[in-house]
Amino acid sequence: VKWNRLKYACCCSLMVSIPVFGQTLEQAVTLTLQNNPDIKSAFNEFTSKRYVNDASTGAYLPSIDLDAGIGYEGLDPSDEVARGDTDYTRKEASVTLTQLIWDGSATLNDIDRTAADAESVRFQLLADASDKALEVAKVYLDAVKAYEVLKLSEDNLAVHKDIYSDISKRVTSGIGSTADLTQVEARIAKAHGNLAAAQNNLYDTHTMFTRLVGQSPQGLIFPRADENFLPYTVDEAVSTAYELHPVIQVALADVDSAKFQYKQSKGVYYPTISIEASQTWRDDADGLKGRSDETLAMLRLRYNLFNGGSDVANADSFAYQLNKAKDLRESAYRNVEEGLKLSWTALDLTLQQKEFLSDHVDSASETVIAYEKQYKIGQRTLLDVLNTQNELFEARKDYLDAKYAEQFAKYRVMNATGQLLSALRVEVPQEWLDKVEY
C-alpha cells in the first residue's frame, strides 16, 4: 500500500486544493446586477415611473394650444335680415394659453402620488437586487463546494484503489481472502458512483451559475462574509431590518401613495381656477366678409355641482385602498421579522452543527491513523482501515455541507437586515440610490 498517500488523505482531512482564480463573489454579484434580465426589467419599471412623475408635474405648467382650420361656411340669415345668403371659404386660427391656478390641490397630490409610486418601485428594485445577490451567493457557494466534493471523491477513489491493489497482492500470494477482495471491489464501485455524482453536481452548479450570472464561472474562490454586518443580537437585527430593509420601505412608500391618492380624490369637491388667454384670427367667418381678430384674457372658475355621487364613491374607494396599504405595511413588518428570525436561527444552529462535525472529522481522521498503525502490527485488517476511511470521507462531506451552509446563513441574515449589498461592497448605480422627493 502507498502509505504516504494514505496518510496524506487521512491527516489532511479538511485540506482541499482549490485553484486560484480571479472571480470573487462580489464580482459575480456586480456582473449579475449589470446583466440579469430580471434586474434590468425592474430598473426599466423604475425609470418608467420616474417619467410618469415628470408627466404629472406638467399639469402645473402652462398649456399652449394652436387651433387652425379652413373650410366652407354657408349662412342663411332670417327674413328680417336684409342681406342675402352667404357662401364663404372660412379661415381661422387661434393660440390659447391656459395656466392652472388651483384645483383643490388635486394636481399637487397627484404629483406627490406618482413620486411615491416611483419611490416604491425604486425600493423594490433594491429589494430585487438584494435577493438576486443572495441567489448568486447561493449558486456561487454551491459551485465552490461542488469542486471540493469532487476533489474529496477523487481522493477517496484513489485510496480505495490503493487498498484494493494491496489486498489483490495478498490474495495472489495466498495470504489474503477472496471475500475481502470482492468486498473491496464493491466499495470501489460505490466510490466510482460517488465520483460520478460529484462530477454531475459540479456540472449542474456551473450551469445554474451561467444562467444566473450571464457567463460561465471563471474560477471561484471560497468567500468569507464580512461579519461586521452581522448584528450581535436578534433584537438588534430586527431593529436594523425595520430601518433598512427595502421591502419595508416599499410598504411605507405605498402607504404614502395611497394617502396622496385619497387626498387627490377629494380635490373635485373644490372649484378649479385657471387663467386663460387667447388670440383668434378669422377670415370670411360668421357671415362677415374680411378679417376679424379676437383677444381674450380670462380668469375662469369651474365648479362641478353634482356628478351622480361618483366623486364621493371614488373617495370612499380610495379610503379603503389607504387602509389596505396600511395593512400591507403591517404585513411587511411581520414578514421581514419572520424571515430575519428564521435566518438567525439557521445561522445559530449551523454554527453549532459545524463544531460537532469538525469534531467528527478530527476523530475519524485519528481513527484512520490509529488503525493504520494497528494494521502494521497485525491487529487490524485493510478492510478495517477502509471502513474508517469511508467514515472519514462521509464526515468530511458533512463538514463541507456545514461549512458552506454557515457562509450562506450569514448572507441570509445580511439580506434579511437589508445590508447584503453593502456587505458585499457592491456599488449599484447612483440613480438607484437617489430618493424621489415628494
Residue locations for each model-derived region?
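Bacterial N-terminal signal peptides that target proteins for export
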Residues: V1-C10
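Periplasmic alpha-helical coiled-coil/stalk elements that build and connect Gram-negative outer-membrane
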Residues: Y8, D131-Y242, S343-A346, T350, ...
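Bacterial Sec-pathway N-terminal export signals of envelope proteins
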Residues: F21-G69, I101, S177, S216-D256, ...
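Small/polar (Gly/Ser/Thr/Ala-rich) solvent-exposed segments
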Residues: K40, S63-Y88, T98-A127, Q249, ...
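Amphipathic alpha-helical coiled-coil segments
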Residues: S41-S56, D128, K132-L152, D162, ...
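Acidic, low-complexity, intrinsically disordered peripheral segments
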Residues: G74, D398-Y438
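Transmembrane beta-barrel architecture of outer-membrane proteins
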Residues: R90-E92, K138, Q183, E236, ...
